[in-house]
């Protein structure tokens, strides 16, 4: 019997699409199996690309998880940023309440991926924290300039509020109902910005 070796035909994709498909494959693996023991070969197989192709886009697992953190942060902040836009309609405190509820809901909906990407990240400040720090800082400064938030220092207030929201949302979403967590986070934020 004369069997010919099977050849695989790969679909040529634009670089941006190929990169996204690799990140999608890595996300599927992380959600299914976690990050422990994840290899470049696993990701290449899941993405249906040659290992060499994978290395054209990412040099290591750390490079892939860093890109996944960036993508996650951009998607989440892109979704939530309009809620705190300067000059937005409605009172700032109501907009902040809406922002916190949407943030808690998004974190709850994606908690497995969030946990996998950010819990053991070996970075000084992850892209999600940096993005929310900048977003809250602009919002607080805008409220201070309008006389709605009588805070003495927008930078320290931002740091305090960010740390408080992180603690309440991280702990609360694992221990209590989402509604209870949202109410606690909203109360904390209101007391911080408008005592």
Named regions from a protein language model:
Residues 67, 78-109, 158-161, 182:
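Hydrophobic alpha-helical connector segments
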Residues 1-6, 88, 105, 134-146, ...:
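C-terminal peripheral helix-coil segments that are non-catalytic and often amphipathic
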Residues 1-33, 37-46, 63-66:
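Basic, helix-initiating cap at the start of DNA-binding domains
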Residues 48-58:
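Short hydrophobic/aromatic patch on the recognition helix
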Residues 74-78, 98, 121-146, 155-159, ...:
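Amphipathic alpha-helical packing segments from all-alpha helical-bundle domains
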Residues 65-72, 117:
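Alpha-helical DNA-contacting segments of helix-turn-helix folds
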Residues 22-30, 72, 76, 103:
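Short hydrophobic clusters on alpha-helical segments that form packing/core surfaces
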Residues 101-124:
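Amphipathic alpha-helical segments used for helix-helix packing
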